[in-house]
Amino acid sequence: MDRVEALKERTGVAIRTMLKALGLSPSKFYQWKRRFGLPNRHNGKMPRDFWLEPWEVKAIVDYARRRPGVGYRYLTYEMLDNDVVAVSPATTYRVLKRHGLLNRWASPGKTGKRGFEQPRRPHEHWHIDISYVSIRGTFVFLIAVLDGYSRFVVHHELRVHMTERDVEIVLQRALERFPRARPRIISDNGSQFVSRDFKRFLALMQLQHVRTSPYHPQSNGKIEALAKTIKRDCIRVEPLFGLEDGRQKVGAFIHYYCYHRLHSAIWYLTPYEVLSGQAGKRLAERDRKLEEARRRRRERTAVDRV
């Protein structure tokens, strides 16, 4: 510090110019200047509110072992909501990595297409799609309507046929469930959705219709992801022994999906919480639990240091 000040007095060159020549930022120089002559104060022993107690580490590890295949972020918010332990996703990640319990995660592919405007409120966009379901070698058809904002399944049916009339029936029943909704209907270019009868039906219901471009996940990927989730976590897990058995099992899974399953795209809340406007309450409760846990750890660390 003294040399720099002396050099400035001798040459008249501004300190910032000298610091630039030395490759040193002014903020770092003045930080050193404020500390000049003071003893070093290491912060390694200062209490951290993310230091976990042994029981918290054990709770995270035990919970992860009971939920194999579940990502660390999902585990974090599930543990928080169920009052198992209150930690951040980063803390859960560190604990699981230390114990060799992290699941491998594949990064999603990128698409060059952009421009689809996402909904800002419930019932602004309804996505509709048809997916094939095999029941003992025979195909039936899952027709589902999904709210694009909340990811809530507005209505679904497992039907024997997939005609335009079947699509109309499913959409009509979805509208009966939410009679005040006037969403924009988003679909692919399947024959049912481009037919004249379907256009007349939408005009009668006073609904706008948007057909998506192929390979464009921003527009209709939400309901395609729903179909994949149902097949992966329900249909391929439990065999379906008939149409009624399939309707019962798929219906039970969709109820779980809407009311109990945390969704990564909506702040790890359930679709129903977002649809019904309860998201703020749940997020505030999580913040309260995390702050209480941090305060308790700080107090425990302070007692240990005495």
Give the residues covered by each predicted segment:
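Short small-residue beta-strand/loop micro-motif enriched in glycine and branched aliphatics
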Residues: R41, R151-H156, V210-T212, R236-V237
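Mobile-element integrase/transposase regions
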Residues: K58, R66, V85-A86, A90-L146, ...
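Short alpha-helical "recognition helix" segments of helix-turn-helix
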Residues: A14-L22, L75
